Protein backbone atom coordinates (compact mmCIF):
# COMPACT_ATOMS: atom_id res chain seq x y z
CA UNK A 1 0.00 0.00 0.00
CA UNK A 2 1.33 3.44 -0.92
CA UNK A 3 0.68 5.93 1.89
CA UNK A 4 0.84 9.57 0.80
CA UNK A 5 3.28 12.04 2.34
CA UNK A 6 1.57 14.23 4.91
CA UNK A 7 3.24 16.54 7.44
CA UNK A 8 -0.07 17.03 9.27
CA UNK A 9 -0.82 13.33 9.31
CA UNK A 10 -3.61 11.26 7.89
CA UNK A 11 -5.54 8.15 8.80
CA UNK A 12 -5.19 5.08 6.59
CA UNK A 13 -6.38 1.50 6.35
CA UNK A 14 -3.49 -0.91 5.88
CA UNK A 15 -3.59 -3.87 3.50
CA UNK A 16 -4.27 -6.19 6.45
CA UNK A 17 -7.33 -4.16 7.49
CA UNK A 18 -5.78 -2.44 10.50
CA UNK A 19 -6.09 1.33 10.79
CA UNK A 20 -3.20 3.70 11.43
CA UNK A 21 -2.20 7.34 11.56
CA UNK A 22 0.78 8.31 9.46
CA UNK A 23 3.02 11.38 9.30
CA UNK A 24 6.04 12.28 7.19
CA UNK A 25 8.28 15.15 8.25
CA UNK A 26 11.27 16.43 6.27
CA UNK A 27 13.76 17.68 8.84
CA UNK A 28 16.91 19.71 8.06
CA UNK A 29 19.12 17.68 10.41
CA UNK A 30 21.27 14.55 10.01
CA UNK A 31 19.77 11.19 10.94
CA UNK A 32 22.10 10.90 13.95
CA UNK A 33 20.74 14.16 15.42
CA UNK A 34 17.14 13.01 15.04
CA UNK A 35 17.99 9.55 16.42
CA UNK A 36 19.56 11.11 19.51
CA UNK A 37 16.41 13.17 20.05
CA UNK A 38 14.28 10.01 19.80
CA UNK A 39 16.41 7.79 22.04
CA UNK A 40 18.56 9.84 24.44
CA UNK A 41 16.79 10.50 27.77
CA UNK A 42 18.46 13.93 28.00
CA UNK A 43 16.69 14.92 24.77
CA UNK A 44 13.42 13.12 25.51
CA UNK A 45 12.88 15.04 28.74
CA UNK A 46 12.80 18.23 26.67
CA UNK A 47 10.25 17.24 24.02
CA UNK A 48 8.57 13.97 25.16
CA UNK A 49 8.91 13.87 28.96
CA UNK A 50 6.33 11.11 29.38
CA UNK A 51 8.37 8.52 27.45
CA UNK A 52 10.91 6.19 29.04
CA UNK A 53 12.30 3.02 27.48
CA UNK A 54 15.19 0.60 27.40
CA UNK A 55 17.05 1.33 24.16
CA UNK A 56 17.30 -2.25 22.94
CA UNK A 57 15.18 -4.79 21.10
CA UNK A 58 12.82 -6.41 23.59
CA UNK A 59 13.34 -3.63 26.13
CA UNK A 60 10.41 -2.24 28.08
CA UNK A 61 8.76 1.11 27.38
CA UNK A 62 6.22 3.29 29.13
CA UNK A 63 4.45 6.41 27.90
CA UNK A 64 2.44 8.67 30.18
CA UNK A 65 0.11 11.12 28.48
CA UNK A 66 -1.53 13.88 30.50
CA UNK A 67 -3.85 16.81 30.07
CA UNK A 68 -6.95 16.43 27.95
CA UNK A 69 -5.91 13.10 26.42
CA UNK A 70 -8.86 11.21 24.91
CA UNK A 71 -6.94 7.96 24.82
CA UNK A 72 -5.28 5.92 27.53
CA UNK A 73 -3.24 7.99 29.97
CA UNK A 74 -0.57 5.27 30.13
CA UNK A 75 0.76 2.86 27.49
CA UNK A 76 3.43 0.23 28.06
CA UNK A 77 4.96 -2.66 26.19
CA UNK A 78 8.12 -3.89 24.48
CA UNK A 79 10.52 -2.28 22.06
CA UNK A 80 9.59 -4.30 18.96
CA UNK A 81 12.15 -2.79 16.55
CA UNK A 82 15.45 -1.10 17.37
CA UNK A 83 17.78 -0.53 14.42
CA UNK A 84 20.03 2.46 15.20
CA UNK A 85 19.88 5.04 13.73
CA UNK A 86 16.99 4.16 11.43
CA UNK A 87 14.06 2.42 13.15
CA UNK A 88 12.50 2.65 16.60
CA UNK A 89 9.23 0.86 17.30
CA UNK A 90 7.53 0.91 20.68
CA UNK A 91 4.60 -1.49 20.44
CA UNK A 92 2.38 -0.06 17.69
CA UNK A 93 4.26 3.26 17.49
CA UNK A 94 7.00 3.40 14.83
CA UNK A 95 9.57 6.03 13.83
CA UNK A 96 11.62 5.44 10.66
CA UNK A 97 14.49 7.71 9.58
CA UNK A 98 16.16 7.94 6.18
CA UNK A 99 18.54 10.40 4.53
CA UNK A 100 16.69 12.96 2.44
CA UNK A 101 18.77 15.59 0.65
CA UNK A 102 20.85 17.37 3.27
CA UNK A 103 18.46 16.32 6.01
CA UNK A 104 16.27 13.46 7.11
CA UNK A 105 12.83 12.07 6.38
CA UNK A 106 11.02 11.01 9.55
CA UNK A 107 8.12 8.62 8.89
CA UNK A 108 5.86 8.09 11.89
CA UNK A 109 3.10 5.47 12.09
CA UNK A 110 0.83 4.43 14.95
CA UNK A 111 -1.54 1.47 14.59
CA UNK A 112 -4.91 2.39 16.07
CA UNK A 113 -6.99 0.46 18.56
CA UNK A 114 -10.54 1.47 17.71
CA UNK A 115 -13.04 1.44 20.57
CA UNK A 116 -16.76 2.14 20.88
CA UNK A 117 -16.23 5.80 19.90
CA UNK A 118 -15.52 4.68 16.34
CA UNK A 119 -12.71 4.97 13.82
CA UNK A 120 -13.16 8.63 12.87
CA UNK A 121 -13.16 9.85 16.47
CA UNK A 122 -10.17 7.74 17.51
CA UNK A 123 -8.22 8.59 14.35
CA UNK A 124 -8.79 12.35 14.72
CA UNK A 125 -7.87 12.29 18.42
CA UNK A 126 -4.67 10.34 17.80
CA UNK A 127 -3.74 12.53 14.81
CA UNK A 128 -4.07 15.68 16.91
CA UNK A 129 -2.01 14.25 19.75
CA UNK A 130 0.86 12.97 17.63
CA UNK A 131 0.88 16.19 15.61
CA UNK A 132 1.56 18.04 18.89
CA UNK A 133 4.40 15.69 19.82
CA UNK A 134 6.04 15.83 16.38
CA UNK A 135 5.82 19.64 16.44
CA UNK A 136 7.45 19.54 19.88
CA UNK A 137 10.27 17.39 18.45
CA UNK A 138 10.81 19.94 15.68
CA UNK A 139 10.89 22.82 18.19
CA UNK A 140 13.44 20.89 20.25
CA UNK A 141 15.61 20.25 17.17
CA UNK A 142 15.39 23.96 16.33
CA UNK A 143 16.72 24.82 19.80
CA UNK A 144 13.38 25.55 21.44
CA UNK A 145 11.71 23.88 24.38
CA UNK A 146 8.29 23.00 25.60
CA UNK A 147 6.16 20.17 26.86
CA UNK A 148 3.58 19.09 24.26
CA UNK A 149 1.33 17.87 27.07
CA UNK A 150 0.74 21.42 28.28
CA UNK A 151 1.87 24.21 26.01
CA UNK A 152 0.99 23.50 22.39
CA UNK A 153 -2.16 24.63 20.66
CA UNK A 154 -2.89 22.60 17.54
CA UNK A 155 -4.57 24.34 14.62
CA UNK A 156 -7.04 21.52 13.96
CA UNK A 157 -8.23 23.23 10.77
CA UNK A 158 -4.92 22.16 9.21
CA UNK A 159 -5.32 18.51 10.16
Regions found by a protein language model. Give the residues of each.
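Terminal "cap-and-tail" regions of soluble proteins that handle hydrophobic small molecules
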Residues: 1-14, 101-105, 111-159
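Hydrophobic ligand-binding cavity/cleft-lining segments
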Residues: 1-51
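Hydrophobic/basic alpha-helical segments enriched in Actinobacteria
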Residues: 18-23, 37-43, 65, 69-70, ...
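Glycine-rich, flexible loop segments associated with nucleotide phosphate handling
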Residues: 19-20, 72-77, 122-126
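Hydrophobic pocket/interface hotspot
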Residues: 34, 44, 61-63, 79, ...
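Hydrophobic-ligand binding "helix-grip"
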Residues: 49-56, 60-116
Amino acid sequence: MQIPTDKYGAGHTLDDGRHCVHFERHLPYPIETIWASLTDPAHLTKWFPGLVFEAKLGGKFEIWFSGECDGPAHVSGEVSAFEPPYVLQLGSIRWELSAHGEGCLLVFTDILYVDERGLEYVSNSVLGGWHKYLDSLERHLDGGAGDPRTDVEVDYSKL
